[in-house]
Amino acid sequence: MAEADTERRPHIPVLLRPLLAAVAPVEGTWLDGTFGAGGYARGLLEAGADRVIGVDRDPLALKMASGWAGDYGDRLRLVAGTFSQLDSHAGAPLDGVVLDLGVSSMQLDLAERGFSFQKDGPLDMRMSQEGESAADLVNTASEETLADILYHYGEERASRRIARAIVEARAAAPITRTLALAEIVARCLPRPKPGQMHPATRSFQAIRIAVNAEFSELVEGLEAAERALRPGGRLAVVTFHSLEDRIVKRFLQLRSGGEGQGNRYAPETRADAPRFTLPLRRAISPDEAELAENPRARSARLRVGVRTDAPAGKVDPQALGTPLIPKKGRR
C-alpha cells in the first residue's frame, strides 16, 4: 500500500546529508528539477557545485526564491518549467540531477493552493497553477474514472464507494472546497483510531497525481535525466510513497542492466549496455535523528544512479510498473 504523503514536506530538505554523501564529490553543473524552497540547490552549492540550475513548474516557488537567489550570483539560475524537459533546460551535459518528488511543504501549508485536507481552501491542487484543477476533475469526471483514479493513484480500497459519494454530492452542488471533499470521503470510511492517517489521505493523493500528471512527468523526467547526464554524472531521486518509488527503483534496475535480454548468449550491443551503475545496494531512509527532527520525512527514500557512456533511450512506462488509468470511461 502507498504510504501517506500528504503530511510529509518539511522546509528542511529531506535526506540532504546522505544525498550529498552518496553523490560526492559535488562539482560541476547540477540541475535541481524540483526547486521548491531551494533547499537542495543551496545544499549543492554549499557542497561545492560550480553551478545549479533550479527548475520548478510552480511560479510561486521561483517568486519566493527571488529574495535570496541573487546571493549566489550566476552560480544559480532559475527556470520556470517541468523536469520532464530538464535536458532542454540544461543546455549542456550535466554533472548531476536531483529530483525531490511530490507536493512541497509550501504547497501544503498554503490553504489557497488547495492541496490540504486539513485546511479549508479552493479545491485546486495545480502545481503549475495552469490547466484543469482538482475541482474541474472532481465535478466532471465520470464515476468510473474517479474510482479508477482513486484506486490506481491512491491505492484506495474504497474507491468505488467514494466515487459514488462524490457523484451524488456534486449532483446537489459543485464540490469546490478542500474540506467539503475531505468530509465526503471521510463519511465513506471508518473513523480513524488515534495515530492513524486521515481518511482522505489516499484520495487527495490520487486526485493530486491525476491533476498534475505526476507519473507521466516522472517517467519522462527520468528519461530526460538519462539524456542530460554526462558519463559519470549522478542522478539522485527522493520519493515519498511506494508508487513513485517503485517507478524509480524499476527504472534504475532496468537501466543498470536488469532488462533481461532475450538471449543471454547473444553479444551485447551498445543499445543493450547499462545506462547507469548503482552505487547504493538499496534505498536510503531517514535515520532516527532526522525523524526526530522532522517526522514528515518518515516515508522518504533516496535512490542514486551513476550514468555510463551508453546511449540514452526510451523506456516503456508499463515496464516500470507505472499505474495507468484505463481509457474507457475517462469522461
UniProtKB/Swiss-Prot annotation:
S-adenosyl-L-methionine binds at residues 38-40, 56, 83, 100, 107. Its EC number is 2.1.1.199. GO terms for cellular component: cytoplasm. It catalyses: cytidine(1402) in 16S rRNA + S-adenosyl-L-methionine = N(4)-methylcytidine(1402) in 16S rRNA + S-adenosyl-L-homocysteine + H(+). One of its GO terms (biological process) is rRNA base methylation. It is found in: Cytoplasm. Keywords: Cytoplasm, Methyltransferase, rRNA processing, S-adenosyl-L-methionine, Transferase. One of its GO terms (molecular function) is rRNA (cytosine-N4-)-methyltransferase activity. Its main location: cytoplasm. Specifically methylates the N4 position of cytidine in position 1402 (C1402) of 16S rRNA. HAMAP family: 16SrRNA_methyltr_H (MF_01007). Belongs to the methyltransferase superfamily. RsmH family. NCBIfam families: 16S rRNA (cytosine(1402)-N(4))-methyltransferase RsmH. This is Ribosomal RNA small subunit methyltransferase H. The lineage of its organism: Bacteria, Pseudomonadati, Pseudomonadota, Alphaproteobacteria, Rhodobacterales.
